[in-house]
Amino acid sequence: MDEKIEKLKSWIAESDNIVFFGGAGVSTESGIPDFRSVDGLYNQKWRYPPETILSHTFFERDPEEYYRFHHEKLVIDGAKPNRAHLRLAELEREGKLTAVVTQNIDGLHTRAGSKNVYELHGSIYRNHCMNCGKFYSAEDIMDMDTVPRCSCGGVIKPDVVLYEEGLDGDVLQGAVTHIMRADMLIVGGTSLAVYPAAGLIDYYRGNRLVPVSYTHLRA
C-alpha cells in the first residue's frame, strides 16, 4: 500500500490538470451511508424499496412518503467534510486539480472549499418550486410541513436527479470536457454501477487513470 500511495503522490506532483471522479464512498467517513454496501441505503428496511422511492413517478404519486425518506435518510444532520474532501480542495488551491465530478448530493465538496464541482445527481441544498421555480434552501424545506410547498402553492422539489430523470445537460457537458482534457483522472468511492454517470470515465484520453481507496485519497 505504501508503494501505491507514493506512486499516487508522484503522479500528482507531475500533473497539473487532475480531475477527481467520485461517489458515495467519499462521504461515508462524514456519517453519510453509501448505497450498495451491506449497511448501505439500498439494504436498509423502509416502507418501499429505496430505488422505488427515489423515482420521479413515486415523487409525483406520493411526495409525502418521499419527503419522509428524504428528511430521514438523505439529509444527515451534522455531516461535515472529511479529510478526503479537504484534500481535494487543497489540490485545487495548489493548481493541481481542475474539477471534481461527483455523483453525491451531499454538497460536502463545496463546503470543503472546492470551487469547480460538477454535481451529476444534483444537491439536497438546492430546492425549487415545481410551479414557479422559486429557490428554497435545505433549511427552508426542513422547517416546513411534511410536503414542502411554495408561497404560490406549488410543491417544492429537491434538485436531486431521481430515477427516470435525465442529468442536467450543462453539468454533464462540463464534466465531460474536463475529463477529456485531464492529464490524470482519479476515481474513488464509487462502484461505477450507476449510468450514465459511470460511463463518463470512458471520455478520459490520458494514461493516468487511478482507482483509489479512501486510504489513498486522504494520505
Where are these regions (language model features)?
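Conserved catalytic core of sirtuin-type NAD+-dependent deacylases
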Residues: M1-R218
